[in-house]
Amino acid sequence: MIQAKTHVFWFVTGSQHLYGEEAVQEVEEHSKMICNGLNDGDLRFQVEYKAVATSLDGVRKLFEEANRDEECAGIITWMHTFSPAKMWIPGLSELNKPLLHFHTQFNRDIPWDKIDMDFMNINQSAHGDREYGFIGARLGIPRKVIAGYWEDREVKRSIDKWMSAAVAYIESRHIKVARFGDNMRNVAVTEGDKIEAQIQLGWSVDGYGIGDLVTEINAVSEQSLSELISEYEELYEWPEGEAARESVKEQARIELGLKRFLSSGGYTAFTTTFEDLHGMKQLPGLAVQRLMAEGYGFGGEGDWKTAALVRMMKMMAGGKETSFMEDYTYHFEPGNEMILGSHMLEVCPSIAEHKPRIEVHPLSMGAKDDPARLVFDGIAGPAVNVSLIDLGGRFRLVINKVEAVKVPHDMPNLPVARVLWKPQPSLRTSAEAWILAGGAHHTCLSYQLTAEQMLDWAEMSGIEAVLINRDTTILNLRNELKWSEAAYRLRKF
């Protein structure tokens, strides 16, 4: 796997000195207990108690420090007492890290027989957080609000999912995509504004001639090749015959060459295209699948937006059950409508139901030798299918909630990995909505991530998001698209 960096989240509690020093000390004690309680759960990332904020200068200095700290992936704020929101304006205005407004309180229950005004003055989250929430709305800053008791399991799960989105946002600002060759000729949706992508999303996209990659492939040693083949033999079912073995060996050579090229340039995502293979013996298939399983992003036919999207979603998902995907063909059986997703070769084995098998079959596109690839059925379960498109003036993230199902029949003549799913709210409505929103045929499919996480990432990134789920109707979606168009046009003025 690509080595992940260490990230923490700062916990900052709002208060004021109006209630006296003892009250501030009590707020600090309670804040530390909440942090310890959050860290006792199943959070992927550590919550670090930072301070009780009681002044404008204190907030500003703290947020400036957070901006500079490379390990800080975001700030969690909570108002234990009333905290006048004017003191938060400079800090919030300068903050460039993800922000979670955690609306909770230290005590779960009202102490009916003991409650007095001292208790009321300390435990004012119910209206202290409303004051703080107003200034967030007034400033128009992107933020997440999670309400609930801090020991509640569902609340912790919501915080954990937001943390994953925040870390993906921070890390995705440094994604570098290597493009081998150009886009597939005459295809529209895989094009896009690379400058705007770097400005808006932080993604850097570089193009290379295929000869640069071929040089690395040809430099692979026989020893490293032999070691990788041994790994293949342990992980996958193997084809019979010497010709098939030679095809697999060539994919291993491509994998090693690709990985060395990407590692040396600091690239964590890449694209290929069957129209640019001069000097290569095969279109990368098994090699791409293996690299995706290690956390690399990939896009077919030069689709750099999807390559970066896959990398970002891989980071958000911790590398689990996430893959490059394409809507391929429909099953229109009444009452059982489904979509079969696949691609020519490149589906990540992280979504495989069983042990993948290596197969070698002809591929008409590319006019090269028969490429080896992993073939498997995808797992069943809830998932999201996500596409990123460039509308010329802005990016739009299109999200569809789906339910992947077990493939009901053998497909012995289909030589590629495949996934079968039922889109929400139905195939007919989801397809109409997807097409109206301009969603691409290339997507990233993830079983680990939720639509809410993708919406959170879009909010952090400042891009439009369209969600297609059980509540979607075409009339409402048409109106939403019109409102979004108007809103983004107004942003330019």
From Swiss-Prot:
Molecular-function GO terms, alphabetical: L-arabinose isomerase activity; manganese ion binding
One GO biological process term: L-arabinose catabolic process to xylulose 5-phosphate
Pathway the protein acts in: Carbohydrate degradation; L-arabinose degradation via L-ribulose; D-xylulose 5-phosphate from L-arabinose (bacterial route): step 1/3
Keyword field: Arabinose catabolism, Carbohydrate metabolism, Isomerase, Manganese, Metal-binding
Co-factor binding details: Binds 1 Mn(2+) ion per subunit.
Obligatory cofactor(s): Mn(2+)
UniProt xrefs under CDD domains: L-arabinose_isomerase (cd03557)
Annotated Gene Ontology cellular component terms: cytosol
EC class (word): isomerase
Domain of life from the UniProt record: Bacteria
Disulphide linkage map: none
Protein name: L-arabinose isomerase 1
Native species: Bacillus licheniformis (strain ATCC 14580 / DSM 13 / JCM 2505 / CCUG 7422 / NBRC 12200 / NCIMB 9375 / NCTC 10341 / NRRL NRS-1264 / Gibson 46)
